[in-house]
UniProtKB/Swiss-Prot annotation:
Gene (name only): def
Species per Swiss-Prot/TrEMBL record: Rhodopseudomonas palustris (strain TIE-1)
Assigned keywords, A-Z: Hydrolase, Iron, Metal-binding, Protein biosynthesis
Name under which the protein is recorded: Peptide deformylase
NCBIfam families: pept_deformyl, PRK00150.1-3
Annotated cofactor note: Binds 1 Fe(2+) ion.
Record field: catalytic activity: N-terminal N-formyl-L-methionyl-[peptide] + H2O = N-terminal L-methionyl-[peptide] + formate
Family: Belongs to the polypeptide deformylase family.
């Protein structure tokens, strides 16, 4: 496993649409391992491959670890897609490893049905709700070049993007 640098807004690569994974290879499994290590070190509960400058449709998540009781449930999702969503909405305060130290409430479907491939190459479908639903939607957005600030008002989004552009020009690096 290797610790990888997480790219930060305003890096244009965050707006790239990630390419599908055509085969679950040793390289994809190693990338997932690197992502878990980088995600835990950050620390975060979800990471899309594009956030470490790898434009492939791979997500790692561990929402159990957020509880802080030493438990863990690392999960990898290859080519994840939302195949159904509830009309009922939920609001969570979201943050992002690529937009450090900024949090905002985002409204998303309360439950979603996802289809994905696991690291053994098995295609699976499952229902997600609560934090799992919010996190998987947030990470799938990354694979499509969408950031959580894109769900905010134009004014709030512009303020956040401007803040990070100014910081980048001044050479301020978030860690």
């Amino acid at each position: 496993m290797a610790l990888r640098e997480i790219i930060i807004l305003p890096d244009k690569r965050l707006r790239e649409i990630s390419k599908p994974v055509t085969e679950v290879t040793t390289e994809i499994r190693k990338l997932a391992d690197d992502m878990f290590e980088s995600m835990y070190e950050a620390p975060g509960i979800g990471l899309a491959a594009i956030q470490i400058a790898e434009p492939v449709r791979l997500i790692t998540m561990d929402i159990v670890r957020k509880e802080g009781d030493g438990k863990s449930d690392p999960r990898a999702f290859i080519n994840p897609e939302i195949v159904g969503a509830s009309s009922e909405m939920n609001v969570y305060e979201e943050g992002c490893l690529s937009i450090p130290e900024y949090y905002a409430e985002v409204e998303r479907p309360k439950t979603v049905r996802i289809r994905y491939t696991d690291l053994d190459g098995n295609v699976k479908e499952e229902d997600a709700d609560g934090l799992f639903a919010t996190c998987i939607q947030h990470e799938i957005d990354h694979l499509n070049g969408v950031l959580f600030v894109d769900h905010l008002s134009k004014l709030k989004r512009a303020m956040v993007i401007r803040k990070f552009e100014k910081a980048a020009k001044r050479g301020i690096k978030y860690v």
